[in-house]
Amino acid sequence: MADDSYKTIKQIAEGYYTEKRSRFISYAIPVRTVEEVKEQLEKYRKQYYDARHVCWAYMLGPERQTFRANDDGEPSSTAGKPILGQINSYELTDLLIVVVRYFGGIELGTSGLIVAYRTAAAEAISAAEIEERTVDEDITVVFEYPYLNGIMRIVKEDNPAIISQKFEMDCEMTLRIRKGEAERLKNRLLKVETAYLKE
């Protein structure tokens, strides 16, 4: 996968797993921020207030550098870590996985818990539609009106999204393009007379 793209899921997906009468209900939830993670966790804790454990893990950002896992009272590293492991094995980001456990009366042991949480997380991911997204960059170019045709020719050839445009004596256009193609576009725009980039 390119440096300017990443994989995530399109919408919430659900998984289910049972082991020795314990039920594991899992959710893969697309999220963008830690605040969204907190909101979703609160929602699932309220929805499953009667469950023994609500364990989770998340990964955020195109560089996959913001992550956390929580065992919610299960033995250390038997729940959150295996859930996070599934997010990593699918190379996903901007994703929260919540696994709810209803205890079935039989202890699963450390290795049994790890397998159960890993499998439940994998079930939710398998049910999700995975999509690749690009990391984009916005470029604002300022130029004099007589040079509009030169700018528009480049826009037509490189095909960035036009976010905003203002046509006066000094024109301004904000373009959005995939990060890997941004430098080339900037260089082409700067070759047009009177053009400069606005920070």
Which positions does each model-derived feature cover?
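Helix N-cap motif at beta-to-alpha junctions
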Residues: 33-34, 144-148, 176-183
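Short amphipathic alpha-helix segments
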Residues: 142-159
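C-terminal regulatory domains involved in ligand/effector binding and gene-expression control
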Residues: 1-77, 164
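Signal for well-folded cores of large energy- and translation-related assemblies
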Residues: 45, 87-88, 118, 122-129, ...
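Conserved short beta-strand edge segments in small beta-sheet-based binding/regulatory domains
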Residues: 161-167, 192-199
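Non-DNA-binding regulatory cores of transcription-related proteins
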Residues: 162-179
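Short glycine-/aliphatic-rich beta-strand segments at the starts of folded cytosolic domains
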Residues: 129-145, 173-175
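Active-site beta-strand/loop microenvironment that shapes enzyme catalytic pockets
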Residues: 79-127
